[in-house]
Every structure is written in C-alpha cells, then in structure tokens.
UniProtKB/Swiss-Prot annotation:
Name of the protein in question: tRNA pseudouridine synthase A
EC number: 5.4.99.12
Swiss-Prot/TrEMBL GO biological process terms: tRNA pseudouridine synthesis
Similarity comment: family membership: Belongs to the tRNA pseudouridine synthase TruA family.
Gene3D superfamilies reported for this sequence: Pseudouridine synthase I, catalytic domain, C-terminal subdomain (3.30.70.660), Pseudouridine synthase I, catalytic domain, N-terminal subdomain (3.30.70.580)
Gene: truA
Matches recorded under NCBIfam families: hisT_truA (TIGR00071)
Chain sites annotated for binding substrate: Y113
Subunit structure: Homodimer.
InterPro entries hit by this protein: PsdUridine_synth_cat_dom_sf, PsdUridine_synth_TruA, PsdUridine_synth_TruA_a/b_dom, PsdUridine_synth_TruA_C, TruA/RsuA/RluB/E/F_N
CDD domains tied to this protein: PseudoU_synth_EcTruA
Residues forming the catalytic site: D52
Amino acid sequence: MTKVALLIAYQGTAYSGWQQQPNDLSIQEVIESSLKKITKTRTPLIASGRTDAGVHAYGQVAHFRAPDHPLFANANLTKKALNAILPKDIVIRDVALFDDNFHARYLTIAKEYRYSLSRLAKPLPWQRHFCYTPRHPFSTELMQEGANLLIGTHDFASFANHGRDYNSTVRTIYTLDIVDKGDSLSIICRGNGFLYKMVRNLVGALLDVGKGAYPPEHLLDILEQKNRREGPSAAPAYGLSLHHVCYSSPYNNFCCEQCSVSTSNEG
C-alpha cells in the first residue's frame, strides 16, 4: 500500500501542539479534518514526533496510508488540495508517495531544532510569536563554550521533563551552534533524537551560562546528576521550531538537502 508523506510547516501559536487533544485544537486534528473533507473518512496521521503547544515547525514530517481515492496517486494534486483547505498557519510544503516501508517516526535518523532569540528590548512585530527576548544580557561566547560541552552522547535525564516514558534517556547531539546575527541569534541543535522539552531546557541552561549564572563547566555537573530537579528552567515554547527531520536512503531527499549528506560523523 502507498504511504503519503507530508512535509509540513506551521505556526504553533494557536494550537495545543501536534498531537490530538480531547478539548484543545491540535495541528494533527486540523490536518486530519482536512483529509476527511476529501476522503469522507478518518485518515490517521503519524508524525516524526510531537511538538508542544506554541512550538512551530518548518519541516515536520507525517505520513498516512493512501485511501482508495484518485487524488492520492498524484503528489502535486494532494499538496494543492490540502493547502486549499488548511488554514493559513499550516502549510504543506511538499508531498511524496512512498512504499509501505516508510514510517515518519521510526525511520528518523536525525532532527534539527532552531531556537530564536532577540536582543531588542521590544521585538519587531513579526518576531513576537517566534523570538524570545531574555531579560538579562548574555554572552554568546560563553554560550558556545557551554554548547560545545553538550555535543556528543550523554545521558540527558537532567534536561528531560517528566511526562513521557523512555527506554533510555541517552541521546547524541551532533551539532549545537550559537549563530549570532546582531540584534537576534539562533541556537541550532541537531541530534539523533530529543527527550520531552529537552531542547528548551538546553536553551535555558545556555542562557544561564550566557548571563553568568554559572560557568560553562557546570553543565557537565548537571548532566552527571541525571536529575531534572538539578536542571535549568525551560526557555519559552514560542522561540522553538522543528526545522527539519532526516531519513536515510531511499527517503533521504524528501525533507531536506542535509539528509543526503553522509552521516558517518553521527554515530
């Protein structure tokens, strides 16, 4: 059976997150509702992972099994039909038709999140839902020092909020870069997977380092504790975006150019 893969961008401001919730509007619910208008039956979506309330996405990936409908035999027509129905804060960027072996969640080999920060006392109007302005000045040099210590394979239990069950809290961060753009900056984090609120907690810790609350080396002590109570406060959700999800061949050219790059340094 054909699986239809969707590359999705959304502004998470008005939603309770990706996953369908009993009493709140979710991204998943809105897209499934749009599919139902086409198929006249519920078509479940499976995403690469769940984004929290207020978190955005430029490159979320989700799939569904193609119902018996002529529209889903053509990727471009599927994209046009869904975008014609969806609200303006959810966009299908691309559609691919894959074999039954594809799975948006289980075949993920890497994800990249980006967190946006502003140095402006009052963010520009178009930044207010996407860019967090810390109350204290911060040093990007100290933040990068701290970020370098977090790269690699570690037990990130101290950076994971409770609320999800994991077989292991060990994850690998491939890159963690502070990109300074003057009035704004991005924290770009790429890894093989992330725990619940892990990226926002990492950003919170790096901001603590940046404002001088503790030295970069203290991040290693936090890691060693393996205790969320020893970890930092999470940065706000609205600064975070799931930028892209990576898959190996033959699905690696769908969601981003970086998926086709060798992952030999990501073991």
